[in-house]
Amino acid sequence: MIKPEAGLVLQDRYRLIERIAMGGMGEVWRAQDLRSGRVVAAKVMRPELAGDELFLQRLRTEAKNARGLRHPNLAMVLDYGEADGSGWIIMELVQGKPLSELIAEKGTLPPSVILPLLAQTARALQVVHEAGVVHRDVKPSNILVNQEGLAKLLDFGISSGANQLPMTATGMVMGTAQYLAPEQATGAA
């Protein structure tokens, strides 16, 4: 079992610096690539999930679905690894705030602000869909916005790829209720 903490080195290469976010499946850490010196993000499986093959498979699927995707509005996945029943994804560190935080701070965003962010997200999703991947959890908290107004779509944790075996049972719904497409909400997708 791997317990994420500052100073831990993954794959003899990525040193964890500080935790920056928590999710249902993992913790996201600011980390340093010891080979290049680059600061990256490391999504590390939560320790209590170590050894759980279902969650490890979801992390593998997330890495596989996001790894080859390249677009200015997608957070780039750089590496993936496993040890001791746990796993991690190394990705580009995106500096910014979740769109959900911007909305909470400012209320309704004017069209001049929100429309460019939505257009950027749509362009990212076009690349994702052309690669045969369905994100399945597009929501404001999975869109980071930097100081220059660049939006980055992240978190492919429940994504589905073409020719992949489903990770859900028939009729099982994955995603965030408020943001589900109608066909997802009814279990038809």
Where are these regions (language model features)?
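Protein kinase glycine-rich loop
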Residues: 16-23, 28
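Conserved N-lobe loop of protein kinases adjacent to the ATP-binding glycine-rich P-loop
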Residues: 32-39
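AlphaC helix of the eukaryotic protein kinase fold
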Residues: 44-68
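Activation-segment/catalytic-loop signature of the eukaryotic protein kinase fold
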Residues: 80
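Conserved short submotifs of the Hanks-type protein kinase catalytic core
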Residues: 84-98, 102
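Activation segment signature within eukaryotic-like protein kinase domains
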Residues: 117-118
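Protein kinase catalytic-loop region centered on the HRD/HxD motif
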Residues: 121-133
